[in-house]
Design a protein with these regions (language model features):
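Active-site glycine-centered loops adjacent to acidic/histidine catalytic or metal-binding residues
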Residues: 53, 77, 99, 161, ...
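Glycine-centered tight turns that cap/initiate beta-strands
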Residues: 45, 69, 104, 202-205, ...
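ATP-dependent adenylate-forming carboxylate-activation enzymes
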Residues: 1-18, 29, 188-193
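Short beta-strand-to-turn element immediately C-terminal to the catalytic PLP-Schiff-base lysine
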Residues: 85-89, 110-111, 127-128
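Short Gly/Pro-enriched turn/cap motifs at secondary-structure boundaries
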Residues: 96-101, 116, 151-155
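Gly/Ser/Thr-rich phosphate-binding loop
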Residues: 12, 20-25, 34-94, 106
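Conserved ATP/PPi-binding loop(s) of AMP-dependent carboxylate-activating enzymes
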Residues: 104, 115-150, 188
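AMP-binding/adenylate-forming catalytic core of the ANL superfamily
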Residues: 23, 113, 147, 162-253, ...
Length: 282
């Protein structure tokens, strides 16, 4: 992901020029693509689209499908694993869902006490090890026995990622355990708040983080990139509208008490939002 050279226009023209049929990109790319005027491009060659790197906001996937007629297939995996969850060919995609477990893995969502979460309950994505580690899982962290033991224990590999499972067995991402915000006794997953903000017409992309607060412990902060036509409106009135929008879209206590407008979000080379960098600046 080249922050200096990337433009959605350039990628879309490449898809048109080379008649690309299969396309994989991080959610960041799709977020910027849907801001373009699709009438300027012929993307009819696209047959199969996937995303990787981080969770995709459902509103982005739905908008892309409306514009192209192509569904985006999502999944979940780590450097330490192969594809753990996915919308495989035999699974109907649900926008925003990571899909269902890869048959080679015994995937569970667990509470901190290692008991199984109920459907709809948030917990940690874990892979049961059994007598032998499944093919595809890493063996250990190089020269880091302490870190290895921290993720391999109680008969499971612990991913450190939070999710919940719906009644049909689809998994939905909530965020890294380290990213969960504890505010006034509530546990708030950043991805749910980001999803709510992304449905507002003013927002291109956003990142939710926690900011220390002497009374609540932490408060929710939103770092927001606005669409060009809304940048002149950045101020208290728009902040209030965005806060009210989140209250309407999700539980009111999850709304961002702090909103900062920026020109761009810090990202990794693969296009993932670097929330840790935002937290460090706060």
């Amino acid at each position: 992901f080249d922050h200096e050279k990337f433009t959605a226009d350039k990628i879309m023209r490449q898809i048109e020029k080379y008649h690309i049929t299969s396309f994989c990109a991080p959610p960041t790319i799709y977020r910027f693509m849907i801001q373009e005027d699709f009438s300027k491009y012929d993307l009819s060659s696209l047959e199969y689209c996937t995303t990787a790197g981080e969770a995709m906001n459902p509103s982005v996937a739905e908008t892309f499908q409306k514009l192209t007629g192509v569904q985006i297939y999502e999944g979940f995996g780590q450097t330490e694993t192969t594809m753990t969850l996915g919308t495989f060919p035999w699974i109907k995609p649900k926008p925003g869902s990571m899909g269902k477990p890869n048959p080679q893995y015994d995937v569970h969502i667990l509470r901190p006490d290692m008991t199984e979460c109920e459907d709809g309950e948030k917990g940690e994505i874990c892979i049961r090890i059994g007598d032998h580690k499944p093919i595809g899982l890493f063996k250990y962290y190089y020269r880091d026995e302490k870190q290895t033991k921290s993720v391999w224990h109680d008969g499971f590999y612990h991913t450190g990622d939070m999710a919940w499972r719906d009644e049909e067995g689809y998994f939905w991402f909530e965020g890294r355990i380290d990213d969960v915000i504890k505010s006034s006794g509530y546990r708030i997953g950043p991805f749910e708040v980001e999803n709510a903000l992304m449905t507002h017409p003013a927002v291109v992309e956003c990142a939710i983080t926690g900011v220390p607060d002497p009374i609540r412990g932490m408060v929710v902060k939103a770092t927001v990139v606005l669409k060009d036509e809304y940048k002149s409106m950045a101020g208290p009135d728009l902040i209030k509208k965005l806060q009210d929008h989140v209250k309407h879209e999700t539980a009111p206590y999850k709304y961002p008490r702090i909103i900062e407008f920026v020109d761009e979000l810090p990202k990794t080379i693969s296009g993932k939002i670097r929330r840790v960098e935002i937290r460090e600046k706060d």
